[in-house]
């Protein structure tokens, strides 16, 4: 179980894990690794005086209304549910529909007070293998601050068909003095990719540092 895993690894996870202000007014609900990016942005915003949080769903099936109700802050006024899929023909994406139904179920069964009536909006992110960046996560929180938040939006892709994508500041970055980032450009067959792959392996194996690399190839031939 998760408790045993935590004791063995030092990493403790819950099926429904909330991170953020205990009295958050804006909450993002999502699954997957993108939640960690959103948590970092939430921490930044909380230090700036906002009241936000992130609820990570690690157990989608069976979905536990009780665990969800225990994890969600009852101070939430706006909840954004992010799905990494587009469900054509449905009223919303799977997690969005699950959260909306769970809030209603929890209120009817007494797990949440009937006064708990947040605005629940849905969004899609990282579609088409797009990156999900801190700038996009901040855009999601900014959308919740609007007088009329955009619902069923996309972030990261400019939706010129339905015009339902939200804008964000692409220059926004989370600066961490303990992190070193670098961008390397190379031409075809010049050895840049191979050299960087070996560099990352050396850093990861021979030092106590954590290393990550991401490579992008265009269609031009060498």
Whereabouts are the PLM-identified features?
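Conformationally flexible catalytic loops at phosphate/diphosphate-handling active centers
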Residues: 1-18
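Generic recognition of flexible, low-complexity loop/linker segments
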Residues: 13-18, 67-69, 169-174, 182-184
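Solvent-exposed alpha-helices and their adjacent loops that cap or buttress functional pockets
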Residues: 18-23, 71-74, 111-114, 147, ...
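Anionic-ligand anchoring segments at beta-strand to alpha-helix junctions in alpha/beta enzyme folds, i.e.
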Residues: 29-58, 178-222
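Short glycine/threonine-rich loop-to-helix capping motif typified by GTGT followed
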Residues: 32, 42-43, 63-74, 92-94, ...
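Core nucleotide-handling region used for phosphoryl-transfer chemistry
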Residues: 48-78
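A structural-propensity feature for long, helix-poor, extended segments
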Residues: 68-87, 215-222
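Peripheral docking tails and interdomain loops at the edges
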Residues: 78-175
């Amino acid at each position: 179980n998760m408790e045993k895993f935590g004791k063995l690894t030092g990493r403790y996870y819950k099926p429904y894990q909330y991170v953020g202000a205990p009295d958050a007014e804006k909450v993002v609900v999502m699954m997957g690794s993108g939640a960690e990016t959103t948590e970092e942005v939430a921490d930044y915003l909380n230090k700036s005086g906002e009241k936000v949080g992130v609820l990570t769903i690690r157990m989608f099936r069976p979905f536990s209304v009780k665990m969800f109700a225990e994890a969600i802050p009852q101070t939430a006024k706006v909840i954004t549910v992010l799905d990494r899929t587009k469900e054509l023909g449905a009223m919303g994406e799977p997690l969005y529909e699950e959260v909306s139904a769970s809030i209603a179920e929890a209120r009817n069964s007494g797990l949440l007070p009937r006064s708990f009536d947040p605005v629940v909006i849905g969004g899609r992110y990282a579609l088409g293998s797009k990156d999900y960046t801190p700038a996009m996560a901040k855009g999601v929180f900014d959308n919740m601050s609007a007088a009329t938040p955009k619902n069923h939006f996309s972030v990261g892709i400019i939706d010129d068909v339905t015009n339902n994508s939200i804008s964000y500041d692409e220059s926004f970055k989370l600066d961490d003095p303990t992190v070193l980032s670098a961008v390397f450009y190379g031409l075809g067959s010049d050895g840049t990719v191979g050299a960087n792959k070996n560099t990352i392996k050396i850093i990861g194996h021979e030092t106590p540092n954590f290393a990550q690399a991401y490579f992008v190839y265009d269609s031009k031939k060498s």
